Amino acid sequence: MTAPASKLLQPITVGPLELKNRIMFPPLTTGYEERDGSIGERSLAFYERLARGGVSYIVIGDVAPVMTASPTPKLATDAQIPTFKALADAVHKHGAKVALQLFHPEYDVPGVGRMVMGSMAAAKAAQEAKAAGDEETFAAKMAESNEIRNQAYAKLHHDMQHFVNEASVEQLIQIKEAIAASAARAQQAGIDAIEVHGDRLVGSLCSAILNQRTDEYGGSFENRVRYALEVVAAIKEAAPQLMVEYKLPVIMENPDGTPRGKGGLQPDEACEFAKLLEGAGIDMIQVAQANHTGNMGDTIPPMGAMPYNWTLPVAERVKALVSVPVATVGRVISVEAGEKILEDGAADIIAYGRSLMCDPDIALKAATGEPIRECLNCNKGCVDAIQNRKYISCVLNAENGDEATVAIKPGEGDKKIAVVGGGIAGLEAARVAAKRGYDVTVYEASDHLGGQIVLAAAPPRKDEIMRSVEYYEKILPGLGVKVELNHAATAEDLNAADAAIVAVGAHDVVIPVPGADSEKVVSSWDVLAGKAELTGRVAVIGGGLVGTETAEYLLQHGCEVAIVEMLDKIAAGESETILPLIMSDFAEHNVEQHVKTRLTAITDEGVEAIRTTEDGAEEPVKIACDYVVMAVGSKANAFDLDGVTVPVTCVGDCSGERTADIASAIRTAYHAANEL
């Protein structure tokens, strides 16, 4: 336990709203909405869970004011008002306020005017034809509009480099009017606030990089921000009862001093714009990373890519210039970090995005001093899901995304539970079983907890993953869980309990080729554990997640590396936000990548393999090396159940299912313990 927070829990007035604390959930694309864009059961359960956890202000991300193929929530017609009223009611029930982040998705493409305008133009022509009684033209134009709209998903999210005509002033007015109309509907639904999405279309107009217009919306700084201020004014006129917030995207700075993000405003311009926003009646400003185009890792960086709170310096500058509350967002992962930001006066409100997905009870725990489950910034369940058009979830939180149906059940009487294995699956099983009121003992054969997580934390930028283990080390004693290290569990140990969960993990494997028993062959696990110190030139067999991360580890320790992979690319399955960092590292160190290549033998000189060429032929390959590292997967460990008389459930890698990742380990353990 730590000391309860004080600053984070102080109320704050934002425009017409009184927020009960300084903790907000910023806008995130979730994928939870229904196909028609309405707020369904999954969305309601997710946002209500955040409110129940004590968050004071929740922003619903990417709400479209028009019907579109873009997979986002939509408030485009009066018929959609009831679902948003249900959302407002669910959040208000727990004392929180809710905002909608409005943006126009059919125009979410790089550059000013790089927008799909055909659907709107065709729909307008269709309505004109209908008014004139021309049913044939009406049908043809509606078909054309629908066809373009159906293609919008691909155009907006997969083919981000196409160029279309610059938007006309009339079209910009139509967009502004649609946003204002949606704000008016939000007011009718009982929503508390509107957040103007200052990136995307609005941000591209503000950007000196992207805005090449020569009319009243281009050229000078005043012209470039004109449209954004007009949108703010239109919202305030259409929904005068609502608080209006502006998300201010800024080009930040990478650790090496280079600009980070495409589009957006430079810091000096952002500060000037903040003063104009205050003059226009904005009630709150959220300073964020700009990323009008490109990899989402620019906006939501993975572990190790950026310092904690990297947007804070600009937020602090903005706060010094305006009197309205300023929020900061970006890798604030702990209660202590949020407290310090507020104590230093650098911001007024702390946005915990991924962190609240990981632990929705941050506010409640801040009041008691209970440790929170800190986000790893791995991006595996959240950002990667967004980029792959799936609904988001947190790898550490088995309930996230399924709040409507998944929760820890009350226990069924007094039970003793034996958990065999102190890796991540065993620790999660112990937590859930203890939360249900059971008497839990964890048996770990080694002298430490964490299992394969300890290995996963060894490569460059990956040390943050150890926070997942540290969380359990903090909370399990308070839940009454007994942990016995250096204790290989026996049948007697299990039989002393009422039920057992076995989470003994897996072991690495070796490809059985000639020479595989050579002293020059070592396992990736031994390398990452520090048991094998290699020098010189190393061939890593296997270019999957473990192989590429082991290669990075070896580069960090001064080795030359060649990777041999059977598939046609390396790092298959790696986070799309982490992959560019790996490939940059490999390019810098001239890592050889032998893809579509199968190991056949290990010799004194190195390795021999067969490569499949582009035309399907096979050719021999010889790669000279001093050491060979096997990184070709793992096989489930077996636990001797001879003599065990109590019910046993296997979870994680030893379950026989191909889990091999932290999310699967957590979820199999959670559900197994929840069914005891």
PLM segments and residue spans:
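Rossmann-like dinucleotide-binding cores of NAD(P)H-dependent redox enzymes
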Residues: 439-479, 551-599, 655-658
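Flavin-dependent oxidoreductase catalytic cores
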Residues: 1-420, 424, 428-435, 439-440, ...
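Short, structured coil segments at secondary-structure junctions
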Residues: 322, 345-346, 479, 517, ...
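SH3/SH3-like beta-barrel fold
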Residues: 607-611
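Rossmann-like dinucleotide/flavin-binding elements
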Residues: 411-445, 484-492, 496, 503-513, ...
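A generic local structural motif
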Residues: 10-12, 44-45, 271-272, 313-315, ...
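Conserved beta-strand termini and adjacent loop/short-helix elements that scaffold enzyme active sites
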Residues: 329, 397, 486-488, 524, ...
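Hydrophobic, well-ordered secondary-structure elements that form the walls
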Residues: 285, 318, 341, 353, ...
